[in-house]
């Protein structure tokens, strides 16, 4: 069942179709598992270490490559007023935000952790999705919840370490 509308962009132009399909399948599975509303949208971009470093520098003031960055559209910024969209009669789909994954960093980490690139891409996609849904790992209690849910989803899908 297709729950998510995923706008996928491969900036690397060399990610195998089966890797893209795997990540889409995992995200669809996770969306169903987490009971995300059907028709919900997100964008997924695969980029290089250089590409993600540029984004990390520009938006997070960290001048280094990272594995995954998520930009949640429903996250409140400082000084923003919360809007209750339920007050409006809108037929627009829910847009969660953007997940950006460095395929180079995924490959490096897969080697470091001793598992497949597919497992690492799946992990990063679910990690990014959970951030879009408001989960975080800045505090130990938050980390326990988020990482526990990540493992639960990946294990249920069959993509274990």
From Swiss-Prot:
Note on cofactor: Binds 1 zinc ion.
Keyword rRNA processing: yes
Cofactor(s) it depends on: Zn(2+)
Positions bound to Zn(2+): 127, 131, 137
Domain of life the protein comes from: Bacteria
Localization, UniProt: Cytoplasm
UniProt keyword list: Cytoplasm, Endonuclease, Hydrolase, Metal-binding, Nuclease, Ribosome biogenesis, rRNA processing, Zinc
Major subcellular site: cytoplasm
GO CC, any one term: cytoplasm
Role, per record: Single strand-specific metallo-endoribonuclease involved in late-stage 70S ribosome quality control and in maturation of the 3' terminus of the 16S rRNA.
PANTHER family referenced in this protein's UniProt entry, alphabetically: ENDORIBONUCLEASE YBEY, CHLOROPLASTIC (PTHR46986:SF1)
Protein name, per record: Endoribonuclease YbeY
Lineage, uppermost ranks: Bacteria, Bacillati, Bacillota, Bacilli, Bacillales
